[in-house]
Amino acid sequence: PQVGAIMVEYGPTAYGHVAVVSMVNGSQIQVREANYNGNQAIGNYRGWFTPGGVTYIYPN
């Protein structure tokens, strides 16, 4: 993925959750998101992670 891409999660527990990719380091990313694990404000709640079960949207 690239910085600025919209990450879309799919699967039984995260279907449709979206986040914006803020950093990329090899196969790991960081994202900014809201409504993750009860957090209402936009922020980076996961740190570096290797995504699974996601696709990306690239805005023009």
Predicted segments, located by residue:
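...with weaker cross-activation on analogous glycine-rich loops/strands in unrelated enzymes
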Residues: P1-N35
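Aromatic- and glycine-rich peptidoglycan recognition patches
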Residues: V24-N60
